[in-house]
Amino acid sequence: MIQTIYEHYGLRPNEFMPVGKFEGFQYRDILYTIINVKQMEQDELNELYQMSQFLMGQGDRHVATFMPNLNGEMITETETEKFIICRCLAEEKNPNFSPGHELAVFHQKGRLFPYEVEKANRLGQWKSMWEKRLDQMEQFWYGRLRALPNQEMEKRFLETFPYYLGLTENAIQYLVDTEIDDLPRSVDAATICHHRFGQKTWGEDYVYKLPADWVFDHPSRDIAEYIREQYLLTYAVDEGHMHQFLSEYEKVNPLSSFSWRLLYARLLFPVHYFEVIEGYYSVQDEKQKQKYYEKLEGVLAHSSHYEAFLKRFYQSVGISTSRYHIPELTWIH
């Protein structure tokens, strides 16, 4: 890869380093991130390029921009590789970095994006995407049920899937009811979001915002996924941290009742369960399979804690469900 980068970009990395879920390198005061785009369509890359250029124009100096190769092309393709390189300033993260405030400002700027988004758009698609994911796993579950597997992980999947099917159906119904009963406000306009926003999405030591992480969606997506990740790190809720994150966000972007309900619907959808099951069946290596099995055991061992977290969510963030006319789920124990 070092020789490939030199031939196509005129840069010779001394060593590679992890940049989030990607690989990259630093040269002088610039951080370069190598992103495999074999699975991405050209139209989606064009949209992400437009978003990065727009946010740079809005004054966000931490946004990574697409770097053209020596031929002036954004995508570099060899016999075995198809990738882009994004670059940004290698600026160390301030100790006082506030994820809630920074995310709110990011959403505020992204809301002004003036171009139509098609390939990277997820707005209004949660229901269909969740239904598709659920249907696929349900069909797979029926297939494994007939096969009578004897591996422990598969037995656990067969035992537990009906519960998570029910949880997913509740998430879908809560989402549908929200879209019927409530009205979006101006703060509910689509903006530039992330596939799964978390504590490390914008880096640990350095601050970077990578276009490959982005989608165009409702801002509650990022807030929900950040809160979910915080819970899953320890299977507990640091209410002080959650309050601070939400308070800092709302100082810039106050959330409507519609936002709160979408946020809650997303927390109800057990994406963490789906990812563990899908991950297990997508790998062949036994060590990796064992890691997924251990993750599943963690999820299952704390399923009642997650229900308790969902039950107390509105109360724990100080939201009056009666004032906002927000329905609460009676089946959660």
Model-predicted regions and their roles:
Residues 1-29, 67-71:
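ATP-binding glycine-rich phosphate-binding loop
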Residues 15, 120-192, 294-298:
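ATP-dependent phospho-/nucleotidyl transfer catalytic cores
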Residues 24, 66, 174-223:
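Active-site acidic catalytic loop and adjacent metal/ATP-binding pocket
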Residues 30-119:
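ATP-binding pocket architecture of kinase catalytic cores
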Residues 69, 265-266:
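Short acidic/histidine-centered micro-motifs embedded in hydrophobic/aromatic stretches
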Residues 121, 257-265:
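All-alpha amphipathic helical-bundle segments outside canonical DNA-binding/catalytic cores
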Residues 220-254, 267-286, 293:
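Active-site activation/catalytic loop segments of kinase-like enzymes and analogous catalytic loops
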Residues 274-333:
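ATP/Mg2+ or Mg2+-diphosphate-binding catalytic cores
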